[in-house]
């Protein structure tokens, strides 16, 4: 159960980061202020919810085990940037993502 909460905290944190990125995107039409407020508001909600879930995780797991699992954020952000904004991800970056996933598996199996 706590593993699900940890993954959800990670996803919400990443969601907040992605909302911040979306808030900075240029608009072709008017409504810049509304666009900015919407995405920043969503970012705050996501980050706040992530913090609450993170506190629940820390009540259960040692921080030395829980914190490295937040490395998943790098994986989620890379995938989202690649899929949503069609950002180029060089092979070296994908190798880094694979190494992060490997590290998470190793650390997770030691818990």
Curated annotation (Swiss-Prot):
Which Pfam families does the UniProt entry name for this protein? EamA
In which pathway is this protein known to take part?
Bacterial outer membrane biogenesis; lipopolysaccharide biosynthesis
Topology with respect to the bilayer:
Multi-pass membrane protein
GO MF term (any one): carbohydrate derivative transmembrane transporter activity
The record ties this protein, via Gene3D superfamilies, to:
1.10.3730.20
Sorted alphabetically, the Gene Ontology cellular component annotations on this record are: plasma membrane
Sorted alphabetically, the Gene Ontology BP terms of this entry are: lipid A biosynthetic process; lipopolysaccharide biosynthetic process
Q: Is rRNA processing included in the keywords of this UniProt record?
A: no
Q: Which residues form the EamA domain?
A: 40-109
Q: Give UniProt keywords alphabetically.
A: Cell inner membrane, Cell membrane, Lipid A biosynthesis, Lipid biosynthesis, Lipid metabolism, Lipopolysaccharide biosynthesis, Membrane, Transmembrane, Transmembrane helix, Transport
Superkingdom of this protein's organism? Bacteria
Query: Mind telling me which residue stretches traverse the membrane in this protein?
Result: 38-58, 61-81, 91-111
Compartment(s) of residence: Cell inner membrane
Q: Which family does it belong to?
A: Belongs to the ArnE family.
What does this protein do, in the record's words? Translocates 4-amino-4-deoxy-L-arabinose-phosphoundecaprenol (alpha-L-Ara4N-phosphoundecaprenol) from the cytoplasmic to the periplasmic side of the inner membrane.
Partners and quaternary state?
Answer: Heterodimer of ArnE and ArnF.
Protein name, UniProt field:
Probable 4-amino-4-deoxy-L-arabinose-phosphoundecaprenol flippase subunit ArnE
């Amino acid at each position: 159960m706590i593993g699900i909460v940890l993954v959800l905290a990670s996803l919400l944190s990443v969601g907040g980061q992605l909302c911040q990125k979306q808030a900075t995107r240029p608009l072709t039409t008017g409504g810049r202020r509304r666009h900015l407020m919407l995405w920043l508001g969503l970012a705050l909600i996501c980050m706040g919810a992530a913090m609450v879930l993170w506190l629940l995780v820390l009540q259960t797991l040692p921080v030395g085990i829980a914190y490295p699992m937040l490395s998943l954020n790098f994986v989620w952000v890379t995938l989202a940037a690649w899929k949503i904004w069609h950002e180029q991800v060089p092979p070296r970056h994908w190798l880094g993502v694979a190494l992060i996933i490997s590290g998470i598996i190793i650390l997770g199996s030691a818990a």
